[in-house]
């Protein structure tokens, strides 16, 4: 099953707030590409797992790499595999390279496998596919590429928070999640993660 081609998805790239992670003096697609490039050295150790999982789910490996880049900076932002500390819960909200949401008030998933394992990548990619399929059902008139972008946004904040294509990122982290991930995926696709 084809979920659309990441190279054909329209994107405005990272917001200024997101690009500030790396003290970049610019935003947009250029910033997303730069952040993907910065993470590429760390990403290389996961490449074979990414390719294998992508092939098994029909998801472009570049998209998996891009989510890893955005969510955990290829593992660089994790503490023993955990990320997104929640001071109210006194616990982390997310697990692994792709930051599976384990918060009972959020995604409520149970972490599967080691933080950088193939099992983790399979779980997270399965969650992504579920969200793409939900967006397909919710917006059957959208092109595959628009549904793919909507699914990326839903991976971040749930399909109930995607209301329109024009406002696809209005509820995402940084208000740029699907645009930034798409631009990073396009960079990874052009730099060895084409499957």
Swiss-Prot record:
* GO molecular function terms listed in the Swiss-Prot or TrEMBL record: lysozyme activity
Stated pH dependence: Optimum pH is 6.0.
**What is known about temperature dependence?**
Optimum temperature is 25 degrees Celsius.
Instruction: Write down the chemical reaction(s) this protein catalyses.
Output: Hydrolysis of (1->4)-beta-linkages between N-acetylmuramic acid and N-acetyl-D-glucosamine residues in a peptidoglycan and between N-acetyl-D-glucosamine residues in chitodextrins
Question: In which tissues has expression of this protein been reported?
Answer: Ubiquitous.
Known EC number(s)? Answer: 3.2.1.17
Per the record, the domain of life is Eukaryota
Enumerate the InterPro entries for this protein.
Answer: Glyco_hydro_23, Lysozyme-like_dom_sf, Transglycosylase_SLT_dom_1
Q: Which terms does the UniProt entry file under GO BP? A: defense response to Gram-positive bacterium; killing of cells of another organism; peptidoglycan catabolic process
Q: Where is the active site?
A: 71, 84
Catalytic EC class: hydrolase
What are the disulfide bonds?
none
Identify the keywords attached in UniProt to this record, alphabetized: Antimicrobial, Bacteriolytic enzyme, Glycosidase, Hydrolase
Gene3D superfamilies in alphabetical order: 1.10.530.10
Q: Which family does it belong to?
A: Belongs to the glycosyl hydrolase 23 family.
Q: What does this protein do?
A: Possesses lytic activity against M.lysodeikticus and several fish pathogenic bacteria.
Q: Spell out the protein name for this chain.
A: Lysozyme g
Phylogenetic placement of the source organism: Eukaryota, Metazoa, Chordata, Craniata, Vertebrata
